[in-house]
A protein has these predicted regions:
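N-terminal hydrophobic or amphipathic helices/low-complexity stretches enriched
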Residues: 1-18
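Cofactor-binding active-site loop characterized by glycine-rich and histidine/acidic residues
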Residues: 25, 38-165
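N-terminal glycine-rich anion-binding loops that anchor highly charged ligand groups
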Residues: 17, 35, 39
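Short coil/turn segments at secondary-structure junctions
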Residues: 2, 6, 27-28, 116
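N-terminal capping segment at the start of a domain
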Residues: 15-31
């Protein structure tokens, strides 16, 4: 499905804004995996602002689409996307990865609204995604599951097992 030039430009502008917010978050935190964050921003922007069906006011809505950031170290980008979308207050970004913050380098699904799976151990996201998609099929649900993998985790055997499922 091709995007119109107007939609494409709007998404490009939003991704640029989110990259700036990611840079601010890195500055406030004093550290972060900025390369991983920058590399995933276009994908997350398009997923969240164009294709995913979600309700910010109801983050655990049963029929929502799921997003799993397998390369959990890119949480430095995921946090700004979730805050910009309205799941969390943008002020939380100023505490990213600081002692006592709900937002660590690897976002915790039990602490950060909008996170569907806690990730960080490389290679587990695809398996979680396959399980989530299989659950949708078994429950006769229409929600989609989006998984973003990092190239460095593709050597993990669990990815290949998930791919063969």
């Amino acid at each position: 499905m091709a995007l119109s030039k107007q939609v494409w430009l709007a998404l490009e502008k939003k991704a640029h804004e989110l990259r700036n917010l990611c840079l601010d978050t890195t500055y406030w935190a004093g550290s972060g995996h900025i390369g991983g964050g920058m590399s995933v921003m276009d994908i997350m922007t398009v997923c969240y602002h164009k294709y995913m069906h979600i309700k910010v006011e109801e983050p655990n809505w049963e029929d929502r689409d799921r997003f799993i950031l397998s390369k959990g170290h890119a949480g430095i980008a995921y946090a700004p996307v979730l805050c910009d979308f309205g799941f969390n207050d943008k002020e939380m970004l100023k505490t990213f990865n600081l002692s006592g913050s709900k937002m660590g380098i690897h976002l915790d699904a039990n602490k950060v609204r909008g996170v569907d799976a806690s990730t960080g151990s490389l290679g587990h996201g695809l398996s979680i995604g396959v399980g989530t998609a299989l659950a949708a099929r078994l429950l006769k649900k229409d929600y989609k599951t989006f998984v973003v993998l990092g190239d460095g985790e593709l050597d993990e055997g669990s990815n290949w097992e998930a791919a063969m499922s």
